[in-house]
Each structure stands twice: as C-alpha cells, then as structure tokens.
Amino acid sequence: MKIIFNSIMICLSIHFFSCNNKEQDVWKVYFFGGQSNMDGFGYNSELPDSLKGIIENAMIFDGNRDNEGNPNGGVGIWAPIEPGHGYEFKTDGKTNNLSERFGPELSFANTLAKKGTKVAIIKYSFGGTALFQGAGYGNWDPDQEGMNHYDNALATIKNAYDDNDINNDGRPDILIPSGIVWMQGEADAGHSQESADAYLGNLKNLMNLIRAAMRKDDLPVIIGKINDSHMYPDGAPTQPYIGTVHLAQDSFTKNDPCAAYVKDTESYKFSSDAWHYDTDGFIKMGQAFAKAAMGLELNCQ
C-alpha cells in the first residue's frame, strides 16, 4: 500500500510542476468513488439525446472494479466520457467494455463542459462496499491487511496519472486536482449500529487520504446523501441505521470548509430493486454534483 501511495506522489509531482505553455491542455480532475449508486444504474436507452453521445472536452479513467484480493483492480485507460460507465462496466487496461448503464459522471461532465471546463474524471467504485471492516461485500478500510478497495482506488489514481497525454493529442496535459465526489454509505447504514457509529471517523480518514493521494490537502469534497427506499415488505427500511450515517455525513460537511452535502437525492425515485435510483435520478445526481463543485470552487480557496 505504501509503495503505491509513494508512486502516486512522484507521478503527481511530475504533472503538477510541468512547464505550463500555451499548447498544453488544462484539465480539472475529479475523483469519483463509492458503492453501487456511484457505479450507476441509469439505463443508456432512456437517456435524452443530449447525453447519448460522447461528451466533448470530457475524459474518464474508469478503474476496473475488482473485489478484494484480486490483482486487476484499478487498471484502465483514459477515454472520452460517454454512456456505459455504469454497472457492469469492465476494462482490462487496454480496452473498455462499456455497459448498458451510466452513473453520475455523465451529466456531471456535461454540465461542467458546457461551462467551458475541460473535465477529467478518475472513477473507482464497487457495489455493496463499506468503510467498516466486516460490513458489506468488501470495504475501504486503509488499515485492513491485504488489498481492498482503498488500494484499488489508489491504483486507479496512480494509473490515471501515469499517462501524461490523456486525450492522446501528442501534447502533455496539465491536470489540476479539483474535487472528490463520494456516493456511499448504504452498506454501513445497513450493517449495524456499530458500523454506523464509526462512519464519521472512517469518512474523515478516507477523504483525507484520498486528498493526499490527489496531492491537495484542502481538495473540495462533495458527499451525496444516501436514502432509504422503504421498499421492503411492510415498508421496512433497507438501512436500519441510516439516521446515524446521515448525521455523520452532515457533520463532516458542516465542519469541513471545503466540503458540500448534496441532499437533492432525497427527491429521486428508486428503481424496482429498492436500492438504486432510476435513470432520471442519476441524471439529476450528476447535475447536482456539478453545481456543488462549481460552488466549492468559488468558496473554497
């Protein structure tokens, strides 16, 4: 883990201190992480025409989503952002295998690109994962022995920064770390009161480590509010301890001057699976994240 982290520091330094000349493209880089609602369950077939094609001036490095202990987590390539980076997306680090789904990255990139920003997204997410050891279908605990999703995220960041020409135009690019977008917490809210109680401390620790990996200690952080569909029989909650996680998310963003809490998710409709938002929800989510990113850029200096 330390070897990966140190490698990130070296390669980021190369990018950040490159000579800035007028021929270099400048990209704002955002790390997208979390569990399945960051993966994305929107259907490409239901997208409006404005989002069905490639988003101009927007690139993505979508790290391969591999579970704990497997060697290929985080491999990937830079590619133009288009639908297909949602649930069941795969890559071998040479070719991307786009899926029939999309996540919040699509409308996020479209919203910022329309404002004239060159957007570069580094994405690593994995469904069902928690910050608390023993919860979910894998976790992000940096102190866990062996490789886990935190390590895969670091590998994704390192691999993304290993390429100094992300749009393959023959000129080195300047990559400016601009934010972290985090959509996660359902696994911790559904596991136990203990995992929910630990969420605030775990979230603080992980966000600061990802900030360090992106080489900016005050990097803006955007937290998406998790929600409960109550679509289990008799209206039972899918996440019995969600109130505690909500308090943690709210506390983190209120006490960090460079963080924002996106609560718009409260109004999104769920799909029939009871856990994931519908297509319209994922479009609105990306737009809300982009709005928060623009606000933090103005207010977090």
Regions found by a protein language model. Give the residues of each.
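Bacterial Sec-dependent N-terminal signal peptides
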Residues: 1-24
